[in-house]
Design a protein with these regions (language model features):
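Conserved active-site segment immediately N-terminal to the catalytic lysine
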Residues: 47-80, 110, 119-124
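Short, flexible helix/strand-to-coil boundary loops that buttress conserved ligand/catalytic motifs
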Residues: 12-13, 50, 57, 66, ...
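Hydrophobic residues in beta-strands of the RecA-like P-loop NTPase core, especially within AAA+ ATPase
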Residues: 22, 46-47
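Active-site PLP attachment segment
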Residues: 64-108, 134
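Short, hinge-like loop/turn segments at secondary-structure boundaries
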Residues: 9-11, 37, 61-65
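Short, Asp-centered acidic motifs that coordinate Mg2+ and/or phosphate
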Residues: 17-18, 44, 68
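PLP-dependent aminotransferase class I/II
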Residues: 3-6, 10, 18-22, 27, ...
């Protein structure tokens, strides 16, 4: 259910600045193919890993591959800080820009403050207050330590679902690519509607009625 790299090529225009690829349900996108498209067209690759904290692509954790990777810390995700999210990058220039962007566009350059005084700062561009509080951070860090166990539990549940659904021809369970490990934020089944007498909404309501 992730984006097709070939479809990305069809959408590129001279105005394109970046590619934002979503790791839907926790399954990493094809980072090799999409990364090559970004590199060939001088574009920034932003990986939306809101669903994919802890997922891996070719034995590398998501967050260590794209130019920037975003994660959600909403209460329904793998770990939470109450609300909000975070962005990671290995690019020092992007990191500097992100720090300004989260703090009202303010630059607190260390060397400049040494020369002109600790009160010195410049508001260099439009920015916002996206700073995570220490209380929120502590909550997230404490849960981050539990992430491996949380991921393992999700994978055990996926195995049970796959076994339970294996002989039901009316649906197709989600697949995991051979070179990736999904974080299984969601377990999305595909209904084979041609073999069913009910549509998706009716099945959804019936499942909800059974809790």
């Amino acid at each position: 259910l992730n984006i097709d790299p070939e479809k990305i090529k069809e959408c590129l225009t001279p105005k394109t600045k970046a590619i934002i690829a979503v790791d839907f349900s926790g399954q990493p996108v094809n980072l090799d193919a999409i990364g090559k498209i970004a590199k060939d067209n001088n574009l920034i690759l932003i990986e939306d890993s809101a669903h994919a904290l802890g997922a891996t692509y070719k034995n590398r954790l998501v967050g260590s591959i794209a130019d920037m990777t975003t994660f959600s810390l909403h209460p329904v995700k793998h770990i939470t800080t109450g609300e909000g999210g975070l962005v990671v990058t290995n690019d020092s220039k992007l990191a500097e820009r992100l720090r300004r962007f989260r703090n009202h566009g303010i630059n607190r350059d260390h060397h400049q403050r040494q020369k002109q005084g600790t009160w010195t700062y410049d508001m260099e561009e439009l920015g916002y207050n996206y700073r995570l509080t220490e209380l929120n951070s502590v909550l997230g860090i404490s849960q981050l330590q539990k992430l491996p166990k949380l991921l393992e539990r999700r994978r055990r549940i996926v195995v049970r679902y796959n076994e339970a659904f294996s002989n039901i021809k009316q649906l197709t369970p989600p697949a995991e690519f051979p070179d990736s490990k999904s974080s299984w934020h969601l377990y999305v089944i595909k209904l084979n509607l041609e073999s069913l007498t009910k549509d998706r909404d009716e099945i959804f309501q019936a499942l909800r009625a059974q809790n």
